[in-house]
Amino acid sequence: MTNIRKTHPLLKIINSSFVDLPAPSSLSSWWNFGSLLGVCLGVQILTGLFLAMHYTSDTATAFNSVTHICRDVNYGWLLRYLHANGASMFFICLYLHVGRGLYYGSYTYSETWNIGILLLFAVMATAFMGYVLPWGQMSFWGATVITNLLSAIPYIGTELVQWIWGGFSVDKATLTRFFAFHFLLPFIVTALVMVHLLFLHETGSNNPTGIPSDPDMIPSHPYYTIKDILGFLVMLTALATLVLFSPDLLGDPDNYIPANPLITPPHIKPEWYFLFAYAILRSIPNKLGGVLALVMSILILAIVPILHMSKQRSMMFRPLSQCLFWLLVAVLFTLTWIGGQPVEHPYIIIGQTASVLYFLIILFLMPTISLLENYLLKW
């Protein structure tokens, strides 16, 4: 008798995607982040759903409803901090996942890569809107500053900003629509994840060597399911440690002050995972130029496949490219640090230098070094 998991219309889809899926035998722990992101998404949707049951999206009561969740709801504090710090874990996994793709040349699967970029934008939009909901000082001023950037768009900018606000400033209408979209977007993200996996399973996984692995495949279950479960345990332990020992480590103290349109915080800054892009935005004195640089800092990933000049797919055997890659990582850490600093000397010039380096490495140095490595291969 044939196994039901191979014949049942629904089970056979799950079977071919997770159980009998052929996977390269050489996948390292860098390939764990896809499944970890799935767990993060699940945790965020579940905790978010329970938080939404107690939250009120009204400017008069939003801040108090979050306080009520933390003080009066059974394990409400746990839900709130799991959700807030779960977002941080989500972005850590997301950036490591993208970094893995860049290092090992996974971007040559262009459909999977492009859906991934869409996912990155969708998750960033979700996180930004979620940050506005507690209606603290940084929520209000962060929303005001970031949405105001759209006013840099010629001709339609001002009308666009007022349309998004639902008035002439960030107010009740803005908060209500942000809550609606923050609730909706994770389900759109889930749908995009399925498309992402669909395209990935068309081509099969890349591997650390970048060499086709068709002759050497193993079934996903039990090998990679066990490996993934170990990853889950490590990540959930890290999340639990963060939530239970220092839940406010990654947050901003200003967000414990209720939103006040009359008092501007001394330093308006987004959550830590947006600081690199915020630093790039601030490094350009022109408003429209800054907005374009901000968008391009992420959108630049879309042209990475076009800039791939190397004869080898992966950076595993390309020491010069590896040096450049880790320089890029150092530049991103520098930008993240600068994004959290005030706009004054010497931070301004450091931020501008790091921003120029970021684009220079991706657009010019990486392809040039790849061509040099191709030339050295002939020797």
From Swiss-Prot:
GO terms for cellular component: mitochondrial inner membrane; respiratory chain complex III. Binds 2 heme b groups non-covalently. GO terms for molecular function: metal ion binding; ubiquinol-cytochrome-c reductase activity. Heme 1 (or BL or b562) is low-potential and absorbs at about 562 nm, and heme 2 (or BH or b566) is high-potential and absorbs at about 566 nm. Belongs to the cytochrome b family. Component of the ubiquinol-cytochrome c reductase complex (complex III or cytochrome b-c1 complex) that is part of the mitochondrial respiratory chain. The b-c1 complex mediates electron transfer from ubiquinol to cytochrome c. Contributes to the generation of a proton gradient across the mitochondrial membrane that is then used for ATP synthesis. This is Cytochrome b. It comes from Artibeus intermedius.
